[in-house]
Amino acid sequence: MNTFRTTALMAVMIVLFALIGQALGGTGGMLLAFLIAVGMNGVSYWYSSSIVLRMYGAEEVSRAEAPELHDLVDRLRRRADLPMPKVCIIPQDQPNAFATGRNPDNAVVAVTKGIMDVLDRDELAGVIAHELAHIKNRDMLTSTVAATLAGAITMLSRFALFFGGRDNNFLVSLLMMILAPMAAMLIQSAISRSREYAADREGAEIAKNPLGLASALRSMERAAEHRPMPANQTTSHMFIVNPFSGGLSGIKRLFSTHPPTEERIARLEEMAGRAQ
């Protein structure tokens, strides 16, 4: 399913670029836009992991440097029947985490310094298991391509505004510039929300402790309000909790890249109740 979803996102980006290129520059513009879109898809597939890690200053740590974290990841990845991912630490105080990589053999689990300080071992196990569930389901490439598509839509809207030409085209381009970021966020949220619920459920199964993950989500959501992290909007959906704010309400929920944390916690608590 995720392979189909990723392919569809790549195809959407190519078609979007080609259509805008055709509108702005005829056949030549369409060909140029097509080549740019193919190039962006290639970069997204092969290099997105290193780009995202560099963006957040994540550094790979060895077992000698972080033995407890490595042991925890190793124990849980064996339980999930996965290859050992690289382990990275992000130098940020906000407790958060994400997984990246184009497939399980090239996966990375990145956690912030803050998560090591705030969460206890059971909570951290829940978070790591959640990220391993993303790896097992091959969610990382889908989320990365979604981030690329979101950035591409925004870039196209700005490009169209400056090269729109006539008044009618200018008005259309201006409208596109206003609506395109909303469309990009809706694409991200539609993909991210279903991914997060599934990773919560499967992560709780891997860790064998739904309440540990529920407690972690509650602590991270609370900390996000008081420990801001410089994050990029196009990659915010990759994190286990929204890095920009604690609670969301009203219209913000529609465009949020994450499901409501209280709903995620409620589902995990219900899951724990059924297991008793």
From Swiss-Prot:
Subcellular location field: Cell inner membrane
Positions with a binding annotation for Zn(2+): 130, 134, 196
Binding note for cofactor: Binds 1 zinc ion per subunit.
Entry cofactors: Zn(2+)
Keyword flag Nucleotide-binding: no
GO cellular component: plasma membrane
One Pfam family here: Peptidase_M48
Annotated catalytic residues: 131
GO molecular function: metalloendopeptidase activity; zinc ion binding
Membrane topology: Multi-pass membrane protein
Catalytic activity, EC: 3.4.24.-
Keyword annotations of the record: Cell inner membrane, Cell membrane, Hydrolase, Membrane, Metal-binding, Metalloprotease, Protease, Transmembrane, Transmembrane helix, Zinc
Domain of life the protein comes from: Bacteria
One example of a Gene Ontology biological process annotation: proteolysis
CDD domains for the chain: M48B_HtpX_like (cd07336)
Regions that span the bilayer: 14-34, 145-165, 171-191
HAMAP family: Pept_M48_protease_HtpX
Family: Belongs to the peptidase M48B family.
PANTHER family linked to this entry: PROTEASE HTPX (PTHR43221:SF1)
Listed name of the protein: Protease HtpX homolog
